[in-house]
Amino acid sequence: MTKKLPSELKQTRKSIQTACEFCHTKHIQCDVGRPCQNCLKRNIGKFCRDKKRKSRKRIEKHGTQPYLNLGKRLVIHDVPSKTVSPSSVHLQRDFLSSDQEKPGKTPAHNTNIQYTYNINDNFQSAGSIPRITNFNTNNGQTVLENTSNNISASQAVHLMNDPIIPTVRKSTLNLKSHFLEQHKAMQQPLATNCLVATSNVPVHSGMDDSNKSDDDVDDETNIHFDSMWCNDEYMKLKDIVDISTPFLPNNSQIFSLQESEYPNPSASTRGNSSLHLTNLLNSTKSVNDQKDSSIGHSTSTFNTYDEVVSRPFISLDMLHLNRGANANTHPSHNAKLESECDSSSHSDADLEKHDTDFISPSKFRELVKTPQDLYDNKCLIKPHNYKLAYTKLLTTLRKKFLEGAEIDKSASVKDEHSTQKHNLRYDLEVIIRSILERYAPIFISLTSNMIEEDLLLQEVTLQRALLDLENMAKLVSCTPMCIWRRSGEICFVSNEFYSLTGFNKNLLLDRTSFIFEYLDHKSVSNYFQIFNELLAFGYNDINKRKKLLMLNACSSTSSKITEGFSFTTDGKAIFTKCNLLLSNGLYLKCACCWTVKRDSFNIPILVMGQFLPIFEMD
């Protein structure tokens, strides 16, 4: 049984309201004296002082009185384009002096508080914050609806896009119903003098009612989830899909323009497909330029915004090449072909000016011969400029598919030579669509969070893997081998490949050369469709992927995928056939194996091609 304590000891062990800092830290019983007995025993009496507690944040449960003499300023950054980032809206509030100050404190002066909130967060605690209930991007205007009854139209809200956070298109921004549901739950009055007038674009008073009806229909077609995390994830996925195909028109525009330009159905289905795509892109750009001019923005402002918002290191900006040259002109088809040939001839010189940091594979191999040399000369390695590489690739494909392909309108449709040129133009359109529709969305989703250091690490990984593959090529000396990047730039060519094709080593490795320059048109079209669909990022179901690939194959005879290809179980190699260009201008039929090498992000960095000639017996 516990011994009963005397009354004096009970008094000393009685809990006190505030302990000293030492007793609070050591979790021992303190007394009311200062210094206390515990500190005196340890000779630290001069440091004995009360433990300061954190002040409680008292939140009123039954609503708050509206602040008096409260001025606010809602600042949202200016958007030169038609998109607004919903995941981050910067608010800047200027709190003036209020009558409801805490006792013991002097009235506070003007305090500038800047913070960031998510539009999906709960607005229950922010009783006086003006809420944005609609994002309207019709005709380049951003209309902000404030739920407050008192609106100050003389003050402006500045809209500017945050370059760090990716923009989201109109379909992901219309969360009107979501905000209205939250507005019904709020029972708190909103502050007056809210600034909601937009200043980035002139607000036209005579806005058509049709625009409002279109916005209402678009709001009803949106998908809303009960969870704000699901909404955020859905918006990110829509962002990936929308940004992956900029300036790419829909099918209705394609077919309508195609029927208008080609009344003959036999000529419109296959012929002039590349011209049709070029005209469509130019017309789309001209419409955008007209919209920009109507709302007071110049083309230079649009291009400046493009440079700020676009990713500086990762880009598939293939359709933006020469988009400003033919935006406002509508020449004939022959004049367009001549302009394309002239632009392609001058584009090489322009690209070389921007390629000052380029080091040819042969010169780089003279500096780096072993893995130790790679890490010793790591300062020489820079992230590869894939944007410039894809621009050069598009120029190479244009030369290969459109060189000398002038169309004679008086020629017969049944002419075999004319039909072949039409098919080549259609194949080029299929290749571009394959990149934009199949490869680009997955690639952007995998690289959306990469930074410059990741790209530098990716380049080091590529060079390290290239050294291993070159050593393997020396061991397997009987197979002609060629290694290229995901953009098609050749990095290594074995001696057997030189012997098979007859080309000089300096011709391939002393400049930027693409593997597609040494394949025929059919092999190039097959490669892009197989690589973008199966080889680039792998596949789960082989049979399902193969059936899907065969269904997506075009009806053109020159671009139809051959059925003679097979897969490996790991999804890293494909066996097929191709026609390899020789130095004498002829093509040699070969059985080839394309093996992909991916990095830790599952992004393809290298493709190794092995070629074995097929000699047909008469």
UniProtKB/Swiss-Prot annotation:
InterPro entries: ERT1_acuK_gluconeogen_tf, PAS_13, Zn2-C6_fun-type_DNA-bd_sf, Zn2Cys6_DnaBD. Keywords: DNA-binding, Metal-binding, Nucleus, Transcription, Transcription regulation, Zinc. Residues 325-352 are annotated as: Disordered. Disulfide bonds: none annotated. SUPFAM superfamilies: Zn2/Cys6 DNA-binding domain. Gene3D superfamilies: Zn(2)-C6 fungal-type DNA-binding domain. It is found in: Nucleus. GO terms for biological process: cellular response to starvation. Residues 335-352 have a biased composition (Basic and acidic residues). GO terms for cellular component: nucleus. Residues 466-538 form the PAS domain. It comes from the Eukaryota. Belongs to the ERT1/acuK family. This is Glucose starvation modulator protein 1. It comes from Saccharomyces cerevisiae (strain RM11-1a) (Baker's yeast).
